Amino acid sequence: MKQPLKNTKRSNYKRKKRERVIALIPTKTNLTSPDKSLTPLPKEIIDYKNVILLRNGITAEGKIFPRRFTKLNAKQQRYMSKAIKNARMVGLLPFVKKSK
C-alpha cells in the first residue's frame, strides 16, 4: 500500500521573521558656518528692503541658495525667495554676476 502524502499546504508553513533594519539618518549640520545660530527668522525681518539679509541667501553668481544651505524652514525659504525676487525687480539685488 502507498503511504499518504504529508500535508504540504502553505498554511502550515511558517515564515521566518526578519528583524527590521532602521536607517540611521545623520543630523543636519550647518554647512555655511558652524557658529551661526539656527534660530528661525520672523516674517517681518525677511523683507525685500533688507538687502544685507538677502545677500546671505544668494550665491556670488546671483542664484538663490537651497534650504539645505540656508537652514530655513519651508515657509521662511518661500518668504526669502519671494523677497529676493522682489528686490531684483526693484533693482536692489543683481539678477546675474557682472562679467569683466
Curated annotation (Swiss-Prot):
GO BP of this protein:
translation
Pfam families given for it?
Ribosomal_S18 (PF01084)
Gene Ontology CC entries for this record: chloroplast; cytosolic small ribosomal subunit
Localization (cell): Plastid, Chloroplast
Q: What is its main location?
A: plastid
For this UniProt record, the keywords arranged alphabetically read as follows: Chloroplast, Plastid, Ribonucleoprotein, Ribosomal protein, RNA-binding, rRNA-binding
Q: Which InterPro entries match?
A: Ribosomal_bS18, Ribosomal_bS18_sf
Q: Chloroplast as a keyword? A: yes
Q: Could you cite one Gene Ontology molecular function of this protein?
A: small ribosomal subunit rRNA binding
Which superkingdom heads the taxonomic lineage of this protein's source? Eukaryota
> What family is this protein classified in?
Belongs to the bacterial ribosomal protein bS18 family.
* PANTHER family recorded: 30S RIBOSOMAL PROTEIN S18, SMALL RIBOSOMAL SUBUNIT PROTEIN BS18M
Q: Partners and quaternary state?
A: Part of the 30S ribosomal subunit.
| Protein name, UniProt field | Small ribosomal subunit protein bS18c
- What organism does the UniProt record list as the source? Pleurastrum terricola
